[in-house]
């Protein structure tokens, strides 16, 4: 059901609304309002060069929307601000062009605890013996830009746009004095950076506009964006825009092994960088530099809204991975938002679908950013202990990238001695079962497979829109069915038809609603294999990964039989995901659920129409391919599609699992690494075509 239809349905039943359906109505109306507002703010920010709210306030609203969409996954939409970058471009004189490589955004963090978590996630994804270094750079508050050089000549400049399509502003970029038009070497490269208006130029510009009676720019970022989109290039030249660059796309093709090397390379080409670049090794080092730059940023000649932390080693980036919006190997630290202090009265614990316990601070009500606040996030018990936060403390709270505010720190100077240490719970607050914490991890979990909170979360996830999309099983109905004993596992959903008479006696369950629910349950048996995989709720396995697994395994029996090596050889499946998959299928409970779902009629296999293999090439089936350098006969996407069509798999890095490396012009470090592994066959583009045509 579409969200607006559900809202209308609830509104038409105002007299019969329960507390829970009333809450649902409020939440759904909030989702619609948040989407409308966030899209309006993005459109104004990216297309009209006007900030209607601060970045900080935008992040709060976005996080609130993310949380509500997680609560009501059946109403998620592809067009939601939570799943896209930038904004759709308006029609103007600038040509719309596709980025050669998507311009992703960065995940935001607002406290050092999130940086610590970021680093811990990185460590889990790579071998323990791997030494890690992190690059710390200032985050400029300007207009993101991508420059393309061909044979050393600047040929194209494109704005971020929506991350996939931007505006060609080459003519105006050429008017910025600091932009290098011709490189000292005749090379091809793409670089990313930020166009800014220096603070001195911003002040001068606004003074001039004030004298002319013109509207003042709210901030340097809006001024820079508005200037770069001027129809008259002379205005761009006169206003004194500047540009700093921080990223070299596909630096490994130029033989560079680290981000720090790529920055030095850019500087050797005359490309302007901020010059603020630090290599650090630990979260403690990063915390020290964050504290330093929070004070020193005011001395910089341009506006900055935070810092960026990146893994330095380029060859680790693919292994660490990406989300649909952001790289997992980089994170932005946003400088602190407005803080207020209040008293921590108590701590309550919430239990999620996976059994994870989350501590919530119960606060003395206080106003923050125009709203009343009485609850805040405490993240996890490790954060509580690290910050030494106690019940009765006066604490600083701030609104950042959280649905609710977060507790930043305790004001220890105001302690009276009556404060109580927050104890780590030993029993689940819902089912009273014992809790466990895996060695080296921060989360406490309820391990009772029958915990009502976990069961309800699993059911809601299973029936959500992106999974089996079963209409009529909202949170309160699921809770009711669990209480009545009709549902203990997801398999029981398909036996609800046996309780038709009993269902009719449930408050608010009319015959029509029951009929629609049972029909929706029956229809769900025909969902695609990848949807059913996603619905199982395997940790680390989202929508995209489910598609990858479905395509690679063809059916669940083959997937369940896969070894760790089999799984990690699949492009897009890392070590953490592989371990989670194996752990999931090893559990007897999950094996029984899968068998039960099969018996109910769910098809854990790719449909015959999807599994056509008429185009496969015996030379490609089961083989792993990778290409490097510039290809003459294919674009990157074309060659990937060709390989997959013929039965092969695309890898993103050189490893012992690679069978063929296709080498184009100006091949980078991948060629050198492949030459060190005797089992890898190295092909020219022409040899690849010959291999393909043998059975094409």
Curated annotation (Swiss-Prot):
Zn(2+) binds at residues 428, 431, 446, 451. DNA ligase that catalyzes the formation of phosphodiester linkages between 5'-phosphoryl and 3'-hydroxyl groups in double-stranded DNA using NAD as a coenzyme and as the energy source for the reaction. It is essential for DNA replication and repair of damaged DNA. HAMAP family: DNA_ligase_A. It holds the Pfam family DNA_ligase_ZBD. Its EC number is 6.5.1.2. The keyword Manganese applies. NCBIfam families: dnlj, PRK07956.1. NAD(+) binds at residues 55-59, 105-106, 137, 160, 194, 310, 334. Coiled coil: none annotated. Residues 615-696 form the BRCT domain. It comes from the Bacteria. Keywords: DNA damage, DNA repair, DNA replication, Ligase, Magnesium, Manganese, Metal-binding, NAD, Zinc. The keyword Endoplasmic reticulum does not apply. It comes from Fusobacterium nucleatum subsp. nucleatum (strain ATCC 25586 / DSM 15643 / BCRC 10681 / CIP 101130 / JCM 8532 / KCTC 2640 / LMG 13131 / VPI 4355). Belongs to the NAD-dependent DNA ligase family. LigA subfamily. GO terms for biological process: DNA repair; DNA replication. GO terms for cellular component: cytosol. This is DNA ligase. Its cofactor is Mg(2+); Mn(2+). The active site is at residue 139. InterPro entries: BRCT_dom, BRCT_dom_sf, DisA/LigA_HHH, DNA_ligase, DNA_ligase_AS, DNAligase_adenylation, DNAligase_N, Hlx-hairpin-Hlx_DNA-bd_motif.
């Amino acid at each position: 059901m579409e969200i607006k239809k559900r809202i209308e349905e609830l509104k038409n039943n105002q007299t019969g609304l329960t507390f829970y359906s009333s809450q649902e109505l409020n939440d759904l109306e909030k989702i619609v309002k948040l989407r409308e507002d966030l899209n309006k703010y993005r459109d104004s920010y990216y297309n009209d060069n006007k900030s209607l709210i601060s970045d900080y306030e935008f992040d709060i609203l976005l996080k609130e929307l993310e949380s509500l969409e997680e609560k009501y996954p059946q109403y998620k939409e592809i067009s939601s601000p939570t799943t896209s970058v930038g904004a759709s471009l308006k029609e103007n004189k600038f040509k719309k062009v596709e980025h050669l490589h998507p311009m992703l955004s960065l995940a935001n963090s607002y406290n050092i605890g999130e940086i610590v978590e970021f680093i811990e996630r990185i460590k889990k994804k790579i071998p323990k013996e791997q030494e890690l270094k992190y690059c710390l750079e200032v985050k400029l508050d300007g207009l993101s830009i991508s420059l393309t050089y061909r044979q050393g000549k600047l040929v194209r400049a494109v704005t971020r746009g929506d991350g996939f399509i931007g505006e060609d502003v080459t003519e105006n970029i050429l008017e910025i004095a600091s932009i290098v038009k011709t490189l000292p070497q005749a090379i091809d490269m793409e670089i990313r950076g930020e166009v800014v208006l220096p603070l001195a130029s911003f002040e001068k510009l606004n003074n001039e506009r004030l004298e002319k009676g013109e509207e003042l720019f709210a901030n340097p970022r809006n001024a820079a964006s508005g200037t770069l989109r001027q129809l008259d290039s002379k205005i761009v030249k006169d206003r004194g825009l500047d540009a700093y660059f921080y990223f070299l796309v596909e630096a490994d093709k130029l033989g560079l092994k680290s981000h720090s090397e790529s920055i030095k390379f850019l500087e050797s080409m005359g490309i302007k960088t901020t010059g603020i670049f630090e290599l650090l090794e630990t979260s403690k080092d990063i915390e020290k530099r964050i504290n330093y730059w929070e004070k020193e940023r005011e001395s910089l000649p341009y506006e900055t809204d935070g810092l960026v932390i990146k893994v330095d080693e380029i060859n680790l980036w693919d292994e660490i991975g990406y989300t649909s919006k952001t790289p997992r190997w980089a994170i932005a630290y946003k400088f602190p938002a407005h803080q207020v202090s209040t008293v921590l009265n108590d701590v309550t614990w919430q239990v999620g679908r996976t059994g994870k316990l989350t501590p919530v601070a119960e606060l003395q009500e206080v106003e923050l950013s125009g709203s009343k606040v009485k609850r805040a996030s405490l993240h996890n018990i490790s954060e509580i202990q690290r910050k030494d936060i106690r019940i009765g403390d006066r604490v600083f709270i701030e609104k950042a990238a959280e649905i609710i505010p977060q507790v930043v720190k305790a004001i220890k100077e105001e302690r009276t001695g009556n404060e109580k240490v927050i104890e780590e719970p030993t029993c689940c607050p819902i089912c009273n079962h014992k809790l466990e914490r895996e060695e080296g991890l921060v989360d406490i979990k309820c391990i009772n497979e029958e915990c009502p909170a976990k069961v309800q979360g699993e059911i809601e996830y299973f029936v959500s829109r992106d999974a089996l999309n079963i209409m009529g099983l909202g949170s309160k109905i699921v809770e009711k069915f669990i209480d009545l004993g009709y549902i203990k596992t997801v398999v029981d959903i398909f036996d609800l038809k046996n309780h038709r008479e009993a269902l009719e006696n449930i408050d608010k369950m009319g015959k029509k609603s029951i009929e629609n629910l049972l029909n929706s349950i029956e229809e769900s048996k025909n969902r695609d294999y990848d949807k059913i995989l996603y619905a199982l709720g395997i940790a680390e396995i989202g929508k995209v990964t489910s598609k990858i697994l479905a395509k690679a395994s063809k059916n669940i029996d083959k997937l369940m039989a896969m070894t760790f090596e089999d799984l990690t050889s699949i492009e897009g499946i890392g070590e953490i995901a592989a371990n989670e998959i194996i752990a999931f299928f090893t559990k007897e409970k999950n094996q029984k659920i899968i068998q039960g779902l099969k018996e109910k009629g769910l098809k854990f296999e790719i449909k015959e129409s999807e599994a056509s293999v008429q185009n496969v090439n015996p030379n490609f089936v089961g083989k792993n391919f990778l290409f490097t350098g510039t290809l003459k006969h294919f674009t990157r996407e074309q060659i990937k599609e060709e390989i997959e069509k013929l039965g092969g798999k695309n890898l993103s890095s050189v490893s012992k699992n690679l069978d063929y490396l296709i080498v184009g012009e100006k091949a980078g470090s991948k060629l050198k690494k492949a030459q060190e592994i005797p089992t890898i066959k190295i092909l020219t583009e022409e040899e690849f075509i010959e291999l393909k045509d043998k059975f094409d």
